[in-house]
From Swiss-Prot:
Tissue-specific expression: Expressed in the respiratory epithelium of the upper airways and the ependymal cells lining the brain ventricles.
Identification of the protein by name: Dynein axonemal light chain 1
Recorded GO CC terms: microtubule; outer dynein arm
Keywords from the UniProt entry: Acetylation, Cell projection, Cytoplasm, Cytoskeleton, Dynein, Leucine-rich repeat, Microtubule, Motor protein, Phosphoprotein, Repeat
Subcellular compartments: Cytoplasm, Cytoskeleton, Cilium axoneme
Modified residues annotated as Phosphoserine in this record: 56
Function: Part of the multisubunit axonemal ATPase complexes that generate the force for cilia motility and govern beat frequency. Component of the outer arm dynein (ODA). May be involved in a mechanosensory feedback mechanism controlling ODA activity based on external conformational cues by tethering the outer arm dynein heavy chain (DNAH5) to the microtubule within the axoneme. Important for ciliary function in the airways and for the function of the cilia that produce the nodal flow essential for the determination of the left-right asymmetry.
Family: Belongs to the dynein light chain LC1-type family.
Domain LRRCT, residue spans: 150-190
PANTHER family: DYNEIN AXONEMAL LIGHT CHAIN 1, NISCHARIN RELATED
Organism this protein belongs to: Mus musculus (Mouse)
Subunit (UniProt): Interacts with ZMYND10 (via C-terminus). Interacts with DNAH5, a outer arm dynein heavy chain. Interacts with tubulin located within the A-tubule of the outer doublets in a ATP-independent manner.
Modified residues (N-acetylalanine): 2
Length: 190
């Protein structure tokens, strides 16, 4: 099998293609590398100005080496092999959007560090119980959640009570699975 692409190699390809220096860039796209990236290695720490980093559609198993990304606001890790959220604490103070659909995440341990997270797209993962889902209520800014395709959502959607049950547990949500959340008791604001 072909050797995995390293972050360093992916960054130098990106630099060739865009003509920008990775250390200066605000947005860096390293998605769908051939062969895929398997590790978030220490080369990421050079991306001090990066606000949006895309590493989707690779074979990454662990979130790591984000400590140098002091300005990171959007992290895209969809379609990888990520099993947990460890490693996010390094960007807990800045990250506003986490796109992590199509992975193998079962537990949401570690999500509570995301003090500014507004948007969480984590469809098609493996979360199956309310105890895990409840950890999302600890996120003070979360307002847009996509959770479709997790066993928990599939079970309750089949029973017809997903939106009610989910919004009861995470009452701050404004949007769930792409649909605006309408609260019955809210008065029309004029």
């Amino acid at each position: 099998m072909a050797k995995a692409t390293t972050i360093k190699e992916a960054l130098s390809r990106w630099e060739e293609k865009t003509g920008q220096k990775p250390s200066d860039a605000k947005e860096i796209k390293l998605y769908a590398q051939i062969p895929p990236i398997e590790k978030m290695d220490a080369s990421l720490s050079t991306l001090g100005n990066c606000e949006k980093l895309s590493l989707s559609t690779n074979c990454i198993e662990k979130i790591a080496n984000l400590n140098g990304l002091k300005n990171l606001r959007i992290l895209s890790l969809g379609r990888n092999n990520i099993k947990n959220l460890n490693g996010l604490e390094a960007v807990g103070e800045t990250l506003e959007e986490l796109w992590i659909s199509y992975n193998f995440i079962e537990k949401l341990k570690g999500i509570h560090v995301m003090k500014k997270l507004k948007i969480l797209y984590m469809s098609n993962n493996l979360v199956k119980d309310w105890a895990e889902f409840l950890k999302l209520a600890e996120l003070p800014c979360l307002e847009d959640l996509v959770f479709v395709g997790n066993p928990l959502e599939e079970k309750h959607s089949a029973e017809g009570n997903w939106i009610d049950e989910a919004t009861k547990r995470v009452p701050k949500l404004k949007k769930l699975d792409g649909t605006p959340v309408i609260k019955e008791d809210e008065e029309e604001e004029s």
